Amino acid sequence: VIGGDECNINEHRFLALVYANGSLCGGTLINQEWVLTARHCDRGNMRIYLGMHNLKVLNKDALRRFPKEKYFCLNTRNDTIWDKDIMLIRLNRPVRNSAHIAPLSLPSNPPSVGSVCRIMGWGTITSPNATLPDVPHCANINILDYAVCQAAYKGLAATTLCAGILEGGKDTCKGDSGGPLICNGQFQGILSVGGNPCAQPRKPGIYTKVFDYTDWIQSIISGNTDATCPP
């Protein structure tokens, strides 16, 4: 996260660190057994850490889990990287709520343009040269009009959100992918992609719109693994 500060240790109990083949992503615990992240974070040797804050000094309740099952949406459009960038992971063992671990529920309404949203992650705090922090950084950004992202990026999928600061300076960045966008306390987005370098004016982040996938997510969690994704 660019332009943010160290997150409060108590504000990200649902935040997962997804580490796979040397690449870093975020994720969100949505109940005791399931984590949501971005599809493009899917690599081999995936490990999922919960209850983390300082990567050098582990919390006593920090846990490591592995994916037992992974669910994706099959693409219906031409395969742009922004389309259906969502992955639902079943953990190999459930986790219990503890001092630094608790799930974040799915949204009951979609966000509106102008909403203030929290971003967070262990991604780089400088760009284009990367500086990876030991602690997650957090910042506040806004849901922007979709036209801003359409002007900045070609081939956007309809099931995405556009969020950032119009004049730049605050943004998610490399290593934050898959992490949550939390607007008015609701889990609304999964970081998909953004500008390179990060935090440039009029180059906001693209987030998978969680609200559009709630039926799919709930179907899979309840055992209907043939559930279809939104178009």
Curated annotation (Swiss-Prot):
- Its recorded name reads Protein C activator
Question: What does this chain do?
Answer: Snake venom serine protease that selectively cleaves the heavy chain of protein C (PROC). This activation is thrombomodulin-independent.
| EC number assigned by the record | 3.4.21.-
Q: Does the keyword Nucleotide-binding apply?
A: no
Enumerate the Gene3D superfamilies for this protein: Trypsin-like serine proteases
Spell out the subunit comment: Monomer.
Annotated compartments? Secreted
Give the UniProt tissue specificity note: Expressed by the venom gland.
Summary of the protein's practical applications: Is used in diagnostic practice for the determination of disorders in the PC pathway. Functional assays are either clotting assays or based on determinations using chromogenic assays. Sold under the name Protac by Pentapharm.
Disulfide bridge map: 7-138, 25-41, 73-229, 117-183, 149-162, 173-198
Q: Which residues carry a glycan? A: 21, 78, 129
Q: Where is the active site?
A: 40, 85, 177
**How is this protein annotated for GO cellular component?**
extracellular region; secretory granule
Give the family this protein belongs to, as stated in its UniProt record. Belongs to the peptidase S1 family. Snake venom subfamily.
Q: Which UniProt keywords apply?
A: Blood coagulation cascade inhibiting toxin, Disulfide bond, Glycoprotein, Hemostasis impairing toxin, Hydrolase, Protease, Secreted, Serine protease, Toxin
Q: Tell me the PROSITE patterns matching this sequence.
A: TRYPSIN_DOM, TRYPSIN_SER
Species of provenance: Agkistrodon contortrix contortrix (Southern copperhead)
Q: Kindly give the Pfam families that the UniProt entry links to this protein.
A: Trypsin
**Which positions fall inside the Peptidase S1 domain?**
1-222
* Taxonomic superkingdom: Eukaryota
The protein's GO terms of the molecular function aspect are: serine-type endopeptidase activity; toxin activity
Protein's GO biological process = proteolysis
